[in-house]
UniProtKB/Swiss-Prot annotation:
Phylogenetic classification of the source organism: Bacteria, Pseudomonadati, Pseudomonadota, Gammaproteobacteria, Pseudomonadales
Annotated family: Belongs to the hydratase/decarboxylase family. MhpD subfamily.
GO terms assigned for molecular function: 2-oxopent-4-enoate hydratase activity; manganese ion binding
Alphabetic keyword roster: Aromatic hydrocarbons catabolism, Lyase, Plasmid
Role: Catalyzes the conversion of 2-hydroxypentadienoic acid (enolic form of 2-oxopent-4-enoate) to 4-hydroxy-2-ketopentanoic acid.
Source organism of this protein record: Pseudomonas putida
Record's protein name: 2-keto-4-pentenoate hydratase 2
Cofactor needs: a divalent metal cation
Length: 270
């Protein structure tokens, strides 16, 4: 599908407007095509450039669609990536305003914090291990600027891989001795377990996902740098979020991470 630069810029602006107004838009695939990866990433990069030009600080990347259960939920069959900005980060057990993310859902992940650059498009598993400074449990709050989560691959890629915000837990651990592949995850919502899985559900190993990201970012000309945060992907199914919810995830060998969402004041006043 032949799409002009002007059209890509218009679609990027529509996504920004959707987030700013809290009003989702229709699927972008109707314009760019459901599988047009090039145009989808072009839209994402336009909004990345806009964000940076307006003072937002890029602090890492998220990998999406690494878990077969999540892929099945969204009807896609390959990973993608999106940007993490400093203003998307929340502290462990902090309260996130419910309106912060459009149509929010949440998933538990393993996060890596790099201490070395990963500049090569032929990055190996060993390279990622050597470059990783810290490993922490994380929660990612995903959201969609596309109405009703009616998305295909091109929609979520253009929409910054459906990123919303994220929470890092602790304690921060060194990677040596950790079994990230075998680590089990249990996530509870208001005290009830609602999602479970393991590191093996994230492209077979969360480090495989990080290798994929390092190679992909090098190919894009934006290689991963020391200090970058990598959200390696969901360890189990994502779960819907309602105002007032509290979530807690425990990842075997890593620790715990929690977050709460504010009560919807408009509902309380009704």
């Amino acid at each position: 599908m032949n799409t002009s630069q002007e059209t890509l810029e218009r679609l990027a602006a529509e996504l920004r407007k959707a987030e700013g107004k809290g009003e989702p838009v229709g699927p972008l695939r109707d314009v760019i095509g459901a599988t047009n990866v090039e145009h989808a990433y072009a839209i994402q990069r336009l909004n990345q450039a806009y964000a940076i030009a307006n003072g937002r600080r890029l602090v890492g990347r998220k990998i999406g669609l690494t878990n077969p259960k999540v892929q099945a939920q969204l009807g896609v069959d390959q990973p993608d990536f999106g940007c993490l900005f400093a203003d998307m980060a929340y502290g462990d057990n902090e309260v996130i305003p419910f309106e912060r993310v459009l149509q929010p859902k949440i998933e538990a992940e393993i996060a890596l914090i790099l201490e070395r650059d990963l500049p090569s498009a032929s990055t190996t598993f060993a390279d990622v291990i050597a470059a990783t400074g810290w490993v922490v449990p994380a929660l990612e709050v995903v959201g969609s600027r596309i109405e009703g989560w009616n998305i295909k691959f091109a929609d979520t890629v253009a929409d910054n891989a459906s990123s919303g915000c994220f929470v890092l837990g602790g304690p921060a651990r060194r990677i040596d001795g950790l079994d990230l592949r075998g680590a089990t995850m249990r996530m509870s919502k208001n005290g009830e377990v609602v999602s479970s899985g393991s590191g093996g559900e994230c492209l077979g190993n969360p480090l495989n996902a990080a290798v994929w990201l390092a190679r992909t970012m090098a190919e894009f000309g934006e290689p991963l740098k020391a200090g970058d945060i990598i959200l390696t992907g969901a360890l189990g199914p994502m779960v819907g979020v309602s105002a007032g919810d509290h979530f807690e995830a425990e990842i075997e060998g890593l620790g715990r991470v929690g977050v709460s969402f504010s009560v919807d004041v408009t509902e309380v006043l009704k």
